[in-house]
Amino acid sequence: MAQTVQNVTLSLTLPITCHICLGKVRQPVICINNHVFCSICIDLWLKNNSQCPACRVPITPENPCKEIIGGTSESEPMLSHTVRKHLRKTRLELLHKEYEDEIDCLQKEVEELKSKNLSLESQIKTILDPLTLVQGNQNEDKHLVTDNPSKINPETVAEWKKKLRTANEIYEKVKDDVDKLKEANKKLKLENGGLVRENLRLKAEVDNRSPQKFGRFAVAALQSKVEQYERETSRLKKALERSDKYIEELESQVAQLKNSSEEKEAMNSICQTALPADGKGSKGSEEDVASKNQGDSARKQPSSSTSSSSHLAKPSSSRLCDTSSARQESTSKAELNCSKNKDLYQEQVEVMLDVTDTSMDTYLEREWGNKPSDCVPYKDEELYDLPAPCTPLSLSCLQLSTPENRESPVVQAGGSKKHSNHLRKLVFDDFCDSSNVSNKDSSEDDISRSENEKKSECFSSPKTAFWDCCSTSYAQNLDFESSEGNTIANSVGEISSKLSEKSGSCVSKRLNSIRSFEMNRTRTSSEASMDAAYLDKISELDSMMSESDNSKSPCNNGFKSLDLDGLSKSSQGSEFLEEPDKLEEKTELNLSKGSLTNDQLENGSEWKPTSFFLLSPSDQEMNEDFSLHSSSCPVTNEIKPPSCLFQTEFSQGILLSSSHRLFEDQRFGSSLFKMSSEMHSLHNHLQSPWSTSFVPEKRNKNVNQSTKRKIQSSLSNASPSKATKS
């Protein structure tokens, strides 16, 4: 077998073609280098040449070509028929012997396995049924009894019976326990299945539930609050440390002053004992000594105040020793003239107290005046106000009035500006009227006041279009993109200050309502985010209702001529600019009408959003005049309940989005502020109490129609949910 395998592998590795005839190899022959040739071809070649035709190796009788036996199947026909029969016979005999040997081995294995199987079955029966064992033992005992009846005693039989009873009882108990455990196992399996199903159901609900919309914002708000509280605690700790150091310095200074006063008193007592007993001379000398003491104390106090650090380095034990020795000397030497020294002692105490007060003031001025470098590193960390939009008022009003906090207002403005910029990263928080946000741009306002005056003059020129602007208390809370936004906000603040002087009662009532609203605003940012989502849904419903109402109204048929409307509005704007006195009268009328509606606002109605457009002076070429209507009537200016928010009135988000698109088309730059949809909804919730608007007396129907058309065109940008759907 191994020989045939070797031949087969060799024949498979050899090439099939001959190198001489280039045909199929017949009776293959190989040279030393294993080149294959036909035997006939190599014989013909060796008649003329004694070298291999492929590798030129000499072929001699010592190194002849070797024949391959069994290389191909052409050698098989060479065998005769009888030889082939014998070969087949031998092959069959070999196979038969092999199969018989295998059958014998398998039969032996089967017998062994049967015997093992029987033994295992008997073991299983004995384990599962112990009674059979007992019965088998009893049968054996019976056989033994029958064989040897005289050998077994009745006592042994009684003992075995007792053992059998105990065994049966134990078996029954174990069986009952097994049944109980099976029932408990079934119950646990059922409970496990129910819990698994409930777990799967909860997982499916969690997978199907939409992700929380404001989860990230709530986490960011909480993180900012934690950082803010940590900064506040660090600031308070540092302030306490500084106050402790300051108190220690003051105590050391007081101890020094006491030591100096006691030393001076001891010296005075010594001088008094040394003086003669004359009354007049003693009084004169006492007065001289007192005057000298005053001069010495007045001279020594500044030096002690300037060198307080060197006195602080001295140990307290030496001071105590000095004071104790001075006291002993003063008591021993002042016993003689006790009655005479009382008045002088009182005068000296008064003089020393006055001197200490002056020296304390000078010490404070020099001590805190010489520390500008100590105050600088705390400017960015502690010297800004920390009340956030959502912090409680009790924590936001905390401030330690240490001497380092009494800095220039420029430093405080810088610190508060940095802090407000840090807090304005979160868009969805409520607007607040805290001092740090309102004083944020104080330095920028001082720097760019000249630009404000120039731009206000440009705005008041008769060439510009009519400006409808309303004063809001939240004007400084909004982020403008460029310096033009800041200057325009300042001009609007000046107009609001003028209007607030004319409407005192209305402003006071609205300020009271805002103050009460700010005091009650202690909610967390997560609740504010949920309110924002709720307001988005309400704005969607209102916009759908307004679309349905506007589709039914007959005013939708005449909205095709925008240029004519723009021309009429520009002519009206020029008339308004020619008559500034009339504008002031109209503003007074609007303020009086707004004050009449305070009762409605106090009864629970929310403030309406009246946005203002801040246009550049180069808006002469624009055809349309952006004027706001608080109602559909062109004469009256009434504040309506929240149900009419999107029907006959501009919301702030609509006006901002439409105006921003128009400004980008006209290439006037980014002069309006950018606000996200959450800030629009929150600002609609926190309405401004300073809502006043210039409304002209003469308005055409085309103006109202254009406003309604603007509402319909920009309702899709009112809420963030509709924007995401589109």
UniProtKB/Swiss-Prot annotation:
Post-translational modification, as annotated: Auto-ubiquitinated.
Basic and acidic residues bias: start-end ranges: 280-290
Catalysed reaction equations from the record: S-ubiquitinyl-[E2 ubiquitin-conjugating enzyme]-L-cysteine + [acceptor protein]-L-lysine = [E2 ubiquitin-conjugating enzyme]-L-cysteine + N(6)-ubiquitinyl-[acceptor protein]-L-lysine
Stretches assigned to coiled coil: 87-129, 155-270
EC number: 2.3.2.27
Keyword set, alphabetical order: Chromosome, Coiled coil, Metal-binding, Phosphoprotein, Transferase, Ubl conjugation, Ubl conjugation pathway, Zinc, Zinc-finger
PROSITE patterns the record matches: ZF_RING_2 (PS50089)
Zinc finger residue ranges, RING-type: 18-56
Low complexity: compositionally biased ranges: 300-320
Region described as Disordered: 274-335, 687-726
One Pfam assignment: zf-C3HC4_2
Major localization listed first in the record, in broad terms: nucleus
SUPFAM superfamilies, A to Z: RING/U-box
Function per UniProt: E3 ubiquitin ligase essential for DNA replication origin activation during S phase. Acts as a replication origin selector which selects the origins to be fired and catalyzes the multi-mono-ubiquitination of a subset of chromatin-bound ORC3 and ORC5 during S-phase.
Quaternary structure, from the entry: Associates with ORC complex. Binds to chromatin; association is cell cycle-regulated, absent from mitotic chromosomes, is associated with chromatin from G1 and partially released from chromatin from mid S-phase.
Name of this chain's protein: ORC ubiquitin ligase 1
